[in-house]
Structure formats: structure tokens, C-alpha cells
Amino acid sequence: MSSTSPNLQKAIDLASKAAQEDKAGNYEEALQLYQHAVQYFLHVVKYEAQGDKAKQSIRAQCTEYLDRAEKLKEYLKNKEKKAQKPVKEGQPSPADEKGNDSDGEGESDDPEKKKLQNQLQGAIVIERPNVKWSDVAGLEGAKEALKEAVILPIKFPHLFTGKRTPWRGILLFGPPGTGKSYLAKAVATEANNSTFFSISSSDLVSKWLGESEKLVKNLFQLARENKPSIIFIDEIDSLCGSRSENESEAARRIKTEFLVQMRGVGVDNDGILVLGATNIPWVLDSAIRRRFEKRIYIPLPEPHARAAMFKLHLGTTQNSLTEADFRELGRKTDGYSGADISIIVRDALMQPVRKVQSATHFKKVRGPSRADPNHLVDDLLTPCSPGDPGAIEMTWMDVPGDKLLEPVVSMSDMLRSLSNTKPTVNEHDLLKLKKFTEDFGQEG
């Protein structure tokens, strides 16, 4: 390279500082600095170094620093168990001479393992989400499969003995906004004896070299210690996409660790269910896809499920909609996902507020008192048209805070919001999902 790039200079500075800390006996600080320096060196090799000779030289330096980092790691690991003479730079550590015992009894006292497990503790859902099966409209096939995989083995363990074993991996796939994550919340609520781990890719990806796969390993270790347990990985495609020549070494290592932990030789996953969710299942690595024994398509809701969603999202809000109105809304929203319907209802719930804001006239009506809803009063004010009998010219600013009676949500509010909200799922994605279902999945 003609001149030293900022990244290369940073790597050199870090390595120099690491060597100083190493000589001073500050081994923990030195280890962090060596690892950090290697990250910068690898970045330079990948994106900045010109010519094979420069790359070869940097790689050789990296190997040297990594070897030293490993020796320091071994020393720090054994430090708590026995007083041991610090290793001089360039000398082999006692762990090299006596054999690596990191897989033996000392692993439970491994400070690094504890740190990684503490990092994952936040992923354990301690408070159960309050989502019942009845709160999930439609998706009967998916609900039955999840009950079969999660609820039945906990309630009737004697049913699942011998060759009859519960499912260990279930993949929920489908268009965005169809309730995949919501179903996982229902599982967490209903499986009240299970430990529920809700994981996203950010929980498992680390900037430090080699730490991401350790996080994956420790996640499964935590799940085994707290079984029966459910590991829910949202947007699993971001962690386990198809392997290619262009992917980074870190991504490949995460994938390999997932494969080993989900069903590797000598791995005991009894009592552990891995639940994955994705909108783009065709990008998943084929080996990862095979680990998910059940692949359930979560489709766009049917008309009856859409009608039920309108009802669920309205909740206890005052409205004038009839059963026939809900059925009509279900028919009019073909191609809309559950999330789209949620947005329509939220917008419709704001329509009465907009009427209050834009009203130029209000009239007095009878209604429940704000102080005591069981007591009716005659001096509440509600928006009206200027021609209404008893209309008083005023704006919402003139209405006392406890005297406003907002209009109820009506069918016309729903239709107005529906006309302003377009579906978020396109036909092209639906065709790809349908093809994937035909090839690898089952209908939910």
C-alpha cells in the first residue's frame, strides 16, 4: 500500500498498545486489545490491502496475535482455579503443556461463559405475554401444530415416549403482518411451564471475532438448563441465509453453530423447541430448512378471520357497527394482512377525534358523566352540523374538558379509513410463498 490507511494505522496502534499491556501484566486488557486489533487487520485485508504480499504479511501478523490471545484466554480461564505463574510473551502457557481442560469440570466456572450467558438473560421472557389462542383470529392449522409440539408434551409427557417424539423445530413463514410473532406470544402465554427465549439477530451478532457462535452455543446451553424451553427466533433469515462465496466468515460460523446445536452429534435437545419466523423462507440455507421438521405457511387471513380481526381490534371502544357490517368489511379487505387491518381500525378510531377537531358547531346531549359513568347528565357537548336543532357555534377549544362526548365509531369511519389504506403484501411475494409451500411446507 502506498500510504498507511487510517484502519491499518488503528490496527497497528491497537496491537502496539496490546503488547505494552501484555508486558505490564494487564492480561485482560491485552486480550481485548489483541482481539480488537485483529478485527481491524482483517478489515484491511478484505477491503483495503493492495497485492498478495501485503495481505500475506498482515495475515501472518494476525495469526501471531491470535495465538497470543488464545494463550492469554487460557491463562485467564485457569487463573481462578489455581495460582499460576504468568506466562511470558512468546512462551507456551501451562494450558498448552497440560492439555486443554476447558471442556471439563472448570467450564461451569468459566467467567467468559458467564458473561455470554448474562448477555442472553435479557432474551428470557420472565413476564408472560397475555395473548391467548382465542386472541389469534383464524390460523387453526398453525395453532393445532403448535399445541401438538408444545402444549401436549408438557401436559401429557407419557404420550411422547419411544418413537413418538414431539417436533423439535417449527418454521412459521408467510407474508409480513400475518401474525407469526403474535402466534409465538400465544405459545409463550399458553406454555406456562416453559422458559420462553425470544431472540432477534441483534442478540446473537457480536463485533468480536468468534463471539457470535459462542452466543449461539450458550443460548442452547441455557435452554437445556431451563427446559422445557422454547427458543423463538424472529426474522431467522437474517442469521441463516443460504451459504455463498461472498458471505463473511462470521456469518458462516454462526450458521454452522446453529446446525450443530439444532441437531448435531451428541447434542441432547429433549424438551427444547426451536420456533423460527420469516417472511422470505426461500433464502434460508437448505440444511437449516431441514432442521425445521414442520414448516407451516401462515397465509393472509380469510374473510371470516378478517371480520373477527376488525372486532378484536375495535375492542370495547363505543361503535355502531353491526354483525353485517363486520362481514362486509371482511369481504372488502381481500389481500389485506392482519397488520393492515390493525392500521385500518387504528385510523378509524381516530375519525371521531378528527370530527371533534374540525367541528364548528356542538350541541348538548344526554350521556354518562365523566366523574361517574353510572350517572347520566344532560349537558355534554358533541360535534354536529350547523343546521342541527340546538347547534351552538363553538370550537373544541371552547368545550370544557369533562363535557365532551365524542361520536361513536361508525361504518362510514371504517370505509373512509379503508379507502385510505392500501395492502402491504404484493402478488409477486405471494406467488413465491405459494411455490415454497408447494415444495417444502404445509398450509397453516
Swiss-Prot record:
Top enzyme class: hydrolase
MIT domain location: 4-82
Catalytic activity: ATP + H2O = ADP + phosphate + H(+)
Assembly with partners or alone: Proposed to be monomeric or homodimeric in nucleotide-free form and to oligomerize upon binding to ATP to form two stacked hexameric or heptameric rings with a central pore through which ESCRT-III substrates are translocated in an ATP-dependent manner. In vitro, associates on the inside of a helical tubular structure formed by a CHMP2A-CHMP3 polymer. Interacts with CHMP1A, CHMP1B, CHMP2A, CHMP4B and CHMP6. Interacts with VPS4A; the interaction suggests a heteromeric assembly with VPS4A. Interacts with VTA1.
GO BP: cell division; endosomal transport; protein transport; vacuole organization
GO CC field: late endosome membrane
Disulphide bond pairs: none
Coiled-coil residue windows: 19-82
Alphabetical list of SUPFAM superfamilies matching this protein: MIT domain, P-loop containing nucleoside triphosphate hydrolases
GO molecular function term, any single one: ATP hydrolysis activity
Protein name: Vacuolar protein sorting-associated protein 4B
The EC number(s) this enzyme carries: 3.6.4.6
Organism of origin: Pongo abelii
Record keywords: ATP-binding, Cell cycle, Cell division, Coiled coil, Endosome, Hydrolase, Membrane, Nucleotide-binding, Phosphoprotein, Protein transport, Transport
Functional summary from the UniProt entry: Involved in late steps of the endosomal multivesicular bodies (MVB) pathway. Recognizes membrane-associated ESCRT-III assemblies and catalyzes their disassembly, possibly in combination with membrane fission. Redistributes the ESCRT-III components to the cytoplasm for further rounds of MVB sorting. MVBs contain intraluminal vesicles (ILVs) that are generated by invagination and scission from the limiting membrane of the endosome and mostly are delivered to lysosomes enabling degradation of membrane proteins, such as stimulated growth factor receptors, lysosomal enzymes and lipids.
Membrane topology: Peripheral membrane protein
Phosphoserine PTM positions: S93, S102, S108, S410
Gene designation per UniProt: VPS4B
Comment on protein domains: The MIT domain serves as an adapter for ESCRT-III proteins. It forms an asymmetric three-helix bundle that binds amphipathic MIM (MIT interacting motif) helices along the groove between MIT helices 2 and 3 present in a subset of ESCRT-III proteins thus establishing the canonical MIM-MIT interaction. In an extended conformation along the groove between helices 1 and 3, also binds to a type-2 MIT interacting motif (MIM2).
Keyword Iron-sulfur part of the UniProt annotation: no
A Pfam family of this chain: MIT
Stated family: Belongs to the AAA ATPase family.
Annotated stretches, region: Disordered: 78-117
Binding site for ATP: G174, P175, P176, G177, T178, G179, K180, S181
